[in-house]
Amino acid sequence: MIHFKGLIFYHYSAGDDVAIHTQDMAWLEESDVVVAEVTQPSLGVGYEIGRAVAWKKRILCLYRPDDGKGLSAMVRGAHDGKNFIVKDYQEPEVPGILKEFLSSS
């Protein structure tokens, strides 16, 4: 577990799939907000975002447009300006984007 100015990041080693799913869903359910980096397509991240939407969590999706790949319309189209935010970003902008998102929670 890594603490960063009030944020907690978890890292764990490979293990039983059911245990990983159970733990990730517990962390997600306990969270107030979800921040997802969505530049690389990921079924797991998409699943977690879907569960977060179902649980009415505030969600921030961060996307680096310079990577040459387009962002899924399902993610970009979910942006509502309030509970589901999609932000294109460059690395130096991340602290400010996080501060703005978390202060409006």
Swiss-Prot record:
Its main location: cytoplasm. PANTHER family: 2'-DEOXYNUCLEOSIDE 5'-PHOSPHATE N-HYDROLASE 1. Pfam families: Nuc_deoxyrib_tr. Belongs to the 2'-deoxynucleoside 5'-phosphate N-hydrolase 1 family. Part of a nucleotide salvage pathway that eliminates epigenetically modified 5-hydroxymethyl-dCMP (hmdCMP) in a two-step process entailing deamination to cytotoxic 5-hydroxymethyl-dUMP (hmdUMP), followed by its hydrolysis into 5-hydroxymethyluracil (hmU) and 2-deoxy-D-ribose 5-phosphate (deoxyribosephosphate). Catalyzes the second step in that pathway, the hydrolysis of the N-glycosidic bond in hmdUMP, degrading this cytotoxic nucleotide to avoid its genomic integration. GO terms for cellular component: cytoplasm; nucleus. It comes from Branchiostoma floridae. Keywords: Cytoplasm, Glycosidase, Hydrolase, Nucleotide metabolism, Nucleus. This is 5-hydroxymethyl-dUMP N-hydrolase. 5-hydroxymethyl-dUMP binds at residues 6, 8, 42, 44, 48, 72. Its EC number is 3.2.2.-. It is found in: Cytoplasm; Nucleus. It is an enzyme of class 3 (hydrolase). GO terms for molecular function: 5-hydroxymethyl-dUMP N-hydrolase activity. Monomer and homodimer. It comes from the Eukaryota. Coiled coil: none annotated. GO terms for biological process: deoxyribonucleoside monophosphate catabolic process; nucleoside salvage; nucleotide metabolic process; positive regulation of cell growth. It catalyses: 5-hydroxymethyl-dUMP + H2O = 5-hydroxymethyluracil + 2-deoxy-D-ribose 5-phosphate.
